[in-house]
Regions:
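Conserved sequence signature across two-component system core domains
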Residues: 6-7, 30, 48
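Receiver (REC) domain switch/output surface
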Residues: 91, 104-116
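Two-component/phosphorelay signaling modules centered on CheY-like receiver
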Residues: 10-28
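Acidic catalytic/metal-coordinating carboxylates
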Residues: 32-35, 58-61
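Charged phosphotransfer/docking patches of two-component systems
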Residues: 10-14, 82, 105
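Receiver (REC) domain active-site loop signature in two-component systems and cognate sites
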Residues: 54
């Protein structure tokens, strides 16, 4: 089963997808929340790596509208005390909050694969 990488930054998406591929896993990608919801509603994923701050729909809105019970790994540079971050972390589907920038992208792959 595939993973879904959702981030508006092309370099981050491609880096994560490449790291998962090197570990033998396939990924789909979405560059915003609207694309993510379309893919989530259409396909089944092992887990979702979801950015918070994105155009069209942000990560918080994706979680609110997402009906499937899929493990979610939040990937974000945002570390402020925004109320949405508290709601995101309280969502039972959120397994881990991963801060950008990533020091070791392969440790993220191990973490996600190990927890799904």
């Amino acid at each position: 089963m595939k993973f879904l990488v959702v981030d508006d930054e092309l370099l981050i998406r491609k880096s994560l997808i490449r790291a998962f591929a090197m570990a033998g896993f396939e990924c789909d990608e979405a560059e915003n929340g609207l694309q993510a919801l379309e893919k989530i509603n259409r396909y089944n994923y092992r887990a979702i790596l979801l950015d918070v701050i994105m155009p069209d729909k942000n990560g918080y809105e994706v979680l609110l509208e997402m009906k499937k019970q899929i493990p979610v790994f939040i990937i974000s540079a945002f570390t402020g005390d925004d109320t949405n971050i508290g709601y995101i972390q309280a969502d039972p589907r959120v397994v881990e909050y991963i801060s950008k920038p990533f020091e070791d992208i392969f440790s993220i792959v191990k973490l996600v694969v190990g927890k799904t």
